[in-house]
Amino acid sequence: MSKIRVYELAKELRVPSKVLINVLMDEFGVEVKNHMSVIEDEDAALIKELLAGSEANSELVAEYEAELAEEVNNAAKKKKKRKKGSEDDSLEQDVEVIEIGKTITVKELAEKLNKPVNDVIKTLIFTGVMAAINQEIDFETAEKVAEKYEVAVYEKEEENTLEEFEEETDVEEENLAKRPPIITVMGHVDHGKTSLLDAIRKSKVTSTEAGGITQHIGAYTVEVNGETLTFLDTPGHEAFTAMRARGAQITDVVILVVAADDGIMPQTVEAINHCKAANVPMIVAINKMDREGANPDRVKQELTEHGLVVEDWGGDIIAVPVSAKTRENIDTLLEMVLLTSEMQELKADAGRKAKGTVVEAKLDKGRGAVATLLVQNGTLHMGDSIIVGSTYGRIRAMFDDSGKKIKSAGPSIPVEVLGLSEVPAAGDRFTVVKDEKTARNMAEARKEKIRQESFATSHRVSLEDLYSQIKEGSVKELSVIVKADVQGSVEAIKASLEKLSTDDVKVRVIHGAVGAISETDITLAAASNAIVIGFNVRPDNNAVAASERDGVEVKTYRVIYDAIEDIKSAMIGMLDPEYKEVVLGTAEIRATYKISNVGTIAGGYVLTGKLVRNADVRVIREGIVIFESKLASLKRFKDDVKEVNAGYECGFSVEKFNDIKEGDIIEAYTMEAVQRKEL
């Protein structure tokens, strides 16, 4: 009877080995010593049946959360023991076992194997790998080296397993309650974004604040008709997209500010495309209505050119004419924001451990690392231990947007916190964990993971690897950013590219504009996994550096046809090839023999072409195809052969078919792939 190791079963069930060991011993009475212990397939099948499904796994992790936390906390101690050379008594196996991460240096591997570094380097050379003493090698290469020394290797589990399972925990519907919406303001420079934010803040500031002055922490809340709105005071789509590129989708509604006297400008178009790419609802604030040249109808007309039709004209985009200077229609704008957010039914569970995102962070001379956190779920309390990206800390003090010290903050509430070990990056996710020790060990594990991932190749989409990514199912559409020297070229390339879309793969131009390829374009491409195409323009120095850093492909052309053909070639490569049938040969059945435990063997004469072993065949009787299968065997006299040519006799059997009769014709054929030349 076959067996399975505990760690292999744990991988299948997506639970930590430690938890599975406890369950096996406590719940099922199966004696296991460690993750390398083996259990019978029957026991494994029963456990799979009982623990299958995410709900069961979540309950399992919740039940053994203490053990998980203990495992994470003891990770650092285990590392120290390994450095001292102490052996792990728990591995009572005949074969020696070592634990390594996704990558390891040659020196570290030699220490774990307890072998001289020179011997390990020689072994690597014999396996075809040239590596120096401090060079990193991947897990598969290390495994091959360990096999030479008869040592088993397994990949160690991430030490932040507890946090990952906490994040996967299902949310109870009855615990969800309404939360305030989070709003970001975007638009062209000098169109009044900051003035509008100031007008909103001054008109809705609470009387309890000293002098009505709000401390700048990167976000603030206002009260509208008894409802709370949270504004991110980080105007500009660059910050918005940079955070989205880090996986932080925190905005619920975007206010797009357009000057009534200026209309749609290049940065306005960028902001529109960024919002569309993020799939966030927009409300247009037509600002500067107090100016003499204000023309809101012109703004509405220009919006339609970018796919935004306002409600007045039969569309679904809300547009509100406002004036930040006179505060005209500010209340109406806020009511529209409230209405849009209500349509989304925004909810969160305030009773959970807090999770959220860093809005901004800085190093203060007197207070150390200071970060503005936006709580997205749960409630953050003073004294909580948190992990933020690859840093950690314990919250020593918390302040709201008015600078007042508070003890807790619920969903959608921004707070400034002190107590972090380092300054995190904007867009980093934070999670409350059991204690500071757990947070520290998780942060160390994350730093190690980041270091290892820096050695891995980028998996950004590119024209060259588009076909393989489609096959893997990782790309369903090709997103493109187009920059050109004139608007006519942008429109021509955009129209031509979008015509290339097929049922399998859609080409989507997420942004098109006039001018050099900028760092902002690269940021959007990184966030949307897009390719940047330039026509008669070049990337600036910052864009080149950003594209190399983020692994974004930038293609430049001088002929529109070349750009279209490159994309078309990549698209053709994505499509499944066409197949045509090629007949290999035919044979006539002249005798049949029935053999027990084998079936019917046919003796035949090859009429045309050749018969090839394992070829697809048709059995034809009186001109009618009666069966299709494969040649199971092919012999000439007593010898197995690969093929028999025309004019020779042979013996063969047809897979899963015994009703062969004299006079039947066997037609052998193959299906050849033909490269597609057009979409």
Curated annotation (Swiss-Prot):
Keywords: Cytoplasm, GTP-binding, Initiation factor, Nucleotide-binding, Protein biosynthesis. Residues 287-290 are annotated as: G4. Residues 178-347 form the tr-type G domain. GO terms for molecular function: GTP binding; GTPase activity; translation initiation factor activity. The keyword Glycoprotein does not apply. Gene3D superfamilies: 1.10.10.2480, P-loop containing nucleotide triphosphate hydrolases, Translation factors, Translation initiation factor IF- 2, domain 3. PROSITE patterns: G_TR_2, IF2. It is found in: Cytoplasm. GO terms for cellular component: cytosol. Residues 187-194 are annotated as: G1. Belongs to the TRAFAC class translation factor GTPase superfamily. Classic translation factor GTPase family. IF-2 subfamily. One of the essential components for the initiation of protein synthesis. Protects formylmethionyl-tRNA from spontaneous hydrolysis and promotes its binding to the 30S ribosomal subunits. Also involved in the hydrolysis of GTP during the formation of the 70S ribosomal complex. This is Translation initiation factor IF-2. It comes from Clostridium perfringens (strain SM101 / Type A).
